[in-house]
């Protein structure tokens, strides 16, 4: 498109230009993947959202970053895949639908339409032909296919387990969905423990690969990789089997036939000789069998209390230790000693096998427990230069030293190396058949069952004889039925859909019941990036050819809050599919960028009740615990200051309470809807504010001043180039290729400095400094145009190049400027400008003059001046001569282009 026919003096940026360019991009398929077949490819992806309805400006940052990168690579000639979709199943959609009294499907698709409209008006360009929605049967069919693949490989299984139960959402949660305080990631409710039959994905089978392959991800933030390493939690040690004696067993006799093996994992097997009691997690499956009858009531009461506590509470180092003796004993395999078995809440089923050998002399938690209940403390490590006595110790000694009271390893130094205690103990255990060296992980298998309606049905059948078998692949998808009552009840609402639940096994003709749980919504997002490669394939999850064309994702963009959940699951599923030969790489995301948040201050008007007196509104009062009665301005100011707020006087005489910067959200009341803002100010203004305010990995504050600054920048572009559009076109068409001279040389150099700066900064996500460089170029071009008094070829070249450099950041105005310069078609088909190294060479450089290494002056010299010229200029410089005086010059050191040092 070109708009050079008439000369109009447009002095300000007009947002009304934007719709025509969005329509043009869509019509011409400028951002459609495959448009440049054979070109180098780029796959850029932002994490897809829950469809929450009309987007606010805070949502845009993630998408603007991805869009800027996409536009940069499109104009550079790449074939770019930049798709979009909707993470539409799961608790967020279902809970919102319940809250507003609408069916989840109606609520979800209505919000998708609103959200899509917001993205389109914001000028975020996606290849919408590849759009996916996870609640569509043609998407979740492949969730079910994936489940069956994992089931065939032994990676999906059903087991009874102690699970995390959300009492508000009435469903099970994976460990990763419970925060450090033991609360649900969605509802915030205190999580309870329940015993339930559930479906799991065996992610632990990939623990070692998930851990080791983090080292390959050199374009991921270190903090994200550290979080994953800590969550996987690799520990080296030994598995040792104790024998648990039944209650009432003779402690002096050989173990009876019904003695139970009790497997313990320890990272310090060398301290086995110091174990004086055992502790089981309250949830351990042997607790009931090992409990003496007279202790059963006390034990069961303790277990009930432990189930109400979070893991963080149970493992707190400062909390007083609690526990109950079961009334039974275990045999320590290294010395045949009978030691008492307790339960205590500081031991978790999630660590090792839910059982520990307690060595109170050398573990602080065990020491506190032993002192609390009067249990013996036996020293097996003596620190250098000290002699510890278990009876008088005031704290555990977990450090280095020499082994004592430890049979075959007495005298060895503590450590894991050759000839040290840990390695020697493992060798002794293995040689004597009492244990083995092993590795364990904190990571637990992924619990995917959910007792909620709005999710992917699990494609399994339950037969009358108790057999559980998969639905045949040709019967997929198992479609989620329409139900009217989908409120959470503690079991899946699907269980009440009798006509759906009761079915026939297609292979045997027997009656069967469908599984009524649905899948965790994180299954949906664990592979969606692969579906984008081949989104309309109705024969397979995606073709190998499409996956090999596009995968892995070159740049993934999203919040750091997904470091453990989504990103870990996506890596796991990708490795499974890699092992099946379906994808070309076993890591899904080559590079990861985690953006900061958009923040805005919350402004709350106060009620003026009398001159100098105000009253806080009720909502603010409740939120900040403020008094209800009227306050003087000084009192109000002091109360607000204590809570991180300020009091501002408005121009109309009113007063407003202003918070500090708060993440923009609907709940905080500080969101700015995308649609109204873009219609008033323009998408390009919003984009410049978001990209210029701060480095994109940092949080940024959205302010009126930032909006005004972005407007000024775009207005200045229009004011500088629009009035000269005809002259610019004529100058560009003149074919004058002469090298710039004089004043033109300075603008030409600045132009190429800017090309280099914007190129390098854009590729490094330094969008704010790239835009700052464009502002500097605009200043230089404006000064040059004013002094030249006319349009010259170098000014015209600057205008045309400016359009291309601006295109990732303010794309609508970039297209408009491109058309003013006589461009036809899209600016994105013109190619990215290359900088000229010769143009960057300076005509003159500053030379530092020194005498005996001390600064004595500066001169400007031609950049190509040789050593002899620089030497002569230095030795005749009046300031240098004044410091040399009548002394003899012994040596002159010349560093061309930098300095001359006269040594006397």
Swiss-Prot record:
Mind telling me which InterPro entries this protein's record contains? aa-tRNA-synth_I_CS, aa-tRNA-synth_Ia, Leu-tRNA-ligase, Leu_tRNA-synth_edit, M/V/L/I-tRNA-synth_anticd-bd, Methionyl/Leucyl_tRNA_Synth, Rossmann-like_a/b/a_fold, tRNAsynth_Ia_anticodon-bd
Q: Where in the cell is it found?
A: Cytoplasm
Q: Which reaction does it catalyse?
A: tRNA(Leu) + L-leucine + ATP = L-leucyl-tRNA(Leu) + AMP + diphosphate
Do the record's keywords include Cytoplasm?
Answer: yes
Q: Which SUPFAM superfamilies match?
A: Anticodon-binding domain of a subclass of class I aminoacyl-tRNA synthetases (SSF47323), Nucleotidylyl transferase (SSF52374), ValRS/IleRS/LeuRS editing domain (SSF50677)
One Pfam family in the UniProt entry: tRNA-synt_1_2
Where ATP binds, per the record, is at: 666
**What's a BP term from Gene Ontology annotated to this protein?**
leucyl-tRNA aminoacylation
**What GO molecular function terms would the record report?**
aminoacyl-tRNA deacylase activity; ATP binding; leucine-tRNA ligase activity
Q: Does the keyword ATP-binding apply?
A: yes
E.C. number? 6.1.1.4
**Mainly localized where?**
cytoplasm
* Alphabetical keyword list: Aminoacyl-tRNA synthetase, ATP-binding, Cytoplasm, Ligase, Nucleotide-binding, Protein biosynthesis
Family of this protein: Belongs to the class-I aminoacyl-tRNA synthetase family.
Q: What is this protein called?
A: Leucine--tRNA ligase
């Amino acid at each position: 498109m070109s708009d050079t026919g008439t000369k109009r003096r447009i002095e300000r940026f007009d947002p009304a230009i934007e719709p025509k360019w969005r329509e043009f991009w869509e019509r011409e398929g400028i951002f459609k993947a495959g448009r440049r077949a054979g070109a180098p490819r780029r796959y850029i992806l932002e994490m897809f959202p829950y469809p929450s309805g009309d987007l606010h400006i805070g949502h845009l940052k993630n998408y603007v970053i991805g869009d800027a990168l996409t536009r940069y690579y499109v104009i550079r000639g790449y074939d770019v895949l930049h798709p979009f979709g909707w993470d539409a199943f799961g608790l967020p959609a279902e809970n919102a639908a319940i809250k507003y009294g609408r069916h989840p499907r109606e609520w979800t698709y209505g919000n998708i339409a609103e959200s899509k409209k917001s993205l389109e008006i914001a000028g975020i360009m996606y290849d919408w032909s590849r759009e996916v929605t996870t609640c569509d049967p043609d998407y979740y069919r492949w969730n079910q296919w994936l489940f069956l693949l994992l089931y065939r490989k032994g990676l999906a299984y059903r087991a009874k387990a102690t699970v995390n139960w959300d009492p508000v959402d009435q469903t099970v949660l994976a460990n990763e969905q419970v925060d450090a305080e033991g609360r649900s990631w969605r509802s915030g409710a205190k999580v309870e423990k329940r015993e339930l039959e559930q479906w799991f994905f065996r992610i632990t089978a990939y623990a070692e690969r998930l851990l080791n392959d983090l080292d390959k991800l050199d374009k991921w933030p270190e903090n994200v990789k550290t979080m994953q390493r800590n969550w996987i939690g690799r520990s080296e040690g030994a598995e040792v089997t104790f024998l648990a004696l039944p209650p009432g067993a003779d402690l002096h006799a050989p173990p009876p036939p019904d003695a139970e093996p009790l497997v313990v994992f320890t990272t310090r097997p060398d301290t086995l000789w110091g174990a004086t009691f055992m502790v089981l997690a309250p949830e351990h499956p042997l607790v009931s069998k090992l409990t003496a009858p007279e202790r059963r009531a006390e034990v069961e009461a303790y277990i009930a209390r432990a189930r109400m506590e979070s893991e963080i509470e149970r493992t707190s180092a400062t909390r007083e230790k609690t526990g109950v003796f079961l009334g039974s004993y275990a045999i320590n395999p290294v010395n045949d000693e009978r030691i008492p078995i307790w339960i205590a809440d500081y031991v978790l089923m999630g660590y090792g096998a839910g059982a520990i050998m307690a060595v109170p002399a050398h573990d602080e938690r065990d020491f506190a427990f032993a002192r609390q209940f009067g249990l013996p403390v036996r020293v097996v490590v003596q620190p250098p230069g000290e002699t510890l006595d278990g009876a008088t110790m005031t704290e555990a000694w977990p450090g280095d030293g020499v082994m004592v009271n430890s049979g075959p390893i007495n005298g060895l130094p503590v450590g894991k190396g050759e000839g040290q205690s840990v390695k020697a103990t493992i060798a002794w255990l293995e040689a004597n058949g009492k244990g083995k060296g092993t590795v364990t992980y904190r990571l637990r298998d992924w619990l995917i069952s959910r007792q909620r309606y709005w999710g992917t049905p699990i494609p399994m059948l339950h037969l009358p004889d108790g057999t559980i078998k998969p639905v045949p692949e040709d019967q997929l998808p198992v479609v989620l039925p329409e139900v009217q009552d989908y409120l959470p009840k503690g079991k899946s609402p699907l269980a009440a859909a009798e006509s759906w639940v009761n079915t026939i096994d297609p292979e045997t003709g027997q009656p069967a019941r469908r599984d009524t749980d649905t899948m965790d919504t994180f299954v949906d997002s664990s592979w969606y990036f692969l579906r984008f490669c081949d989104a309309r394939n109705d024969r397979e999850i995606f073709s190998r050819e499409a996956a090999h064309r596009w995968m892995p994702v070159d740049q993934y963009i999203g919040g750091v809050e997904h470091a453990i959940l989504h990103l870990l699951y996506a890596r796991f599923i990708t490795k499974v599919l890699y092992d099946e030969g379906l994808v070309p790489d076993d890591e899904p995301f080559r590079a990861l960028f985690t953006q900061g948040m958009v923040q805005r201050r919350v402004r709350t008007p106060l009620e003026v009740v009398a001159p100098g007196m105000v009253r806080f509104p009720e909502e603010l009062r409740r939120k900040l615990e403020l008094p209800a009665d009227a306050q003087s301005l000084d009192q109000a100011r002091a109360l607000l200051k204590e809570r991180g707020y300020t009091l501002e006087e408005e121009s109309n005489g009113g007063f407003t309470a202003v918070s500090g910067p708060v993440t923009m959200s609907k709940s905080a009341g500080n969101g700015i809807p995308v649609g109204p803002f873009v219609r008033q100010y323009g998408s390009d203004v919003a984009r410049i504010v978001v990209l210029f305010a701060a480095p994109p990995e940092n949080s940024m504050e959205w302010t009126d001043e930032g909006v005004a600054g972005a407007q000024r920048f775009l207005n200045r572009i229009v004011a500088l180039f629009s009035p000269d559009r005809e002259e610019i076109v004529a100058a560009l068409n003149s074919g004058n290729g002469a090298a710039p001279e004089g004043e033109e040389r300075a603008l030409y150099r600045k132009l190429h400095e800017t090309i280099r700066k914007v190129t390098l900064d854009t590729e490094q996500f330094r969008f704010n400094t790239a835009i700052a460089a464009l502002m500097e170029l605009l200043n230089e071009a404006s000064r040059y145009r004013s002094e030249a008094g006319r349009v010259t070829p170098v000014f015209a070249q600057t205008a045309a190049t400016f359009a291309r450099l601006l295109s990732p950041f303010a794309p609508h105005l970039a297209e408009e400027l491109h058309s003013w310069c006589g461009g036809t078609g899209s600016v994105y088909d013109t190619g990215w400008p290359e900088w000229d190294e010769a143009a960057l060479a300076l005509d003159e450089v500053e030379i530092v003059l020194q005498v005996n290494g001390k600064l004595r002056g500066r001169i400007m010299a031609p950049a190509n001046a040789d050593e002899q010229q620089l030497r002569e200029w230095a030795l005749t410089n009046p300031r240098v001569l004044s410091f040399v005086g009548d002394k003899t010059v012994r040596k002159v050191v010349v560093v061309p282009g930098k300095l001359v040092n006269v040594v006397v």
